[in-house]
Amino acid sequence: MPTYVVLAKWTDQGIRAVKESPRRLDATRKSIEAAGGKLLGFYLTMGRYDEVLIVEGPSDEVTATLALSAGSEGNVRTETLRAFPEAEYRNIIAKIP
């Protein structure tokens, strides 16, 4: 399954309800699993983003749907990056003429 790095930043609404964040994380994990994916890692971060999630998703389309769904709740804004593990990276580089 493809791997994704999801960078999340709380909105004003999300930070006002920050104590609900663990419950929202649990709901996010359930949504990812229900869509056939897996939450591989979660980190609270300092700096530009408040949270980083490492997710395996069945496809770009499914992962985009999950990110849009999370954003539509109004607590976070997300930026999703497709991540290529080392083996895929090496394969991609090997194909360069």
List the predicted regions and their residue ranges:
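Short, well-ordered beta-strand segments in beta-rich or mixed alpha/beta enzyme
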Residues: 5-9, 43-66
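Short S/T/G/P-rich N-terminal loop/turn motif that feeds into the first structured element of a domain
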Residues: 1-33, 38-40, 49, 86-97
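A short linear hydrophobic-aromatic micro-motif
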Residues: 36-43, 78-80
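An amphipathic, aromatic/His-enriched active-site/gating alpha helix that lines ligand/cofactor pockets
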Residues: 57-84
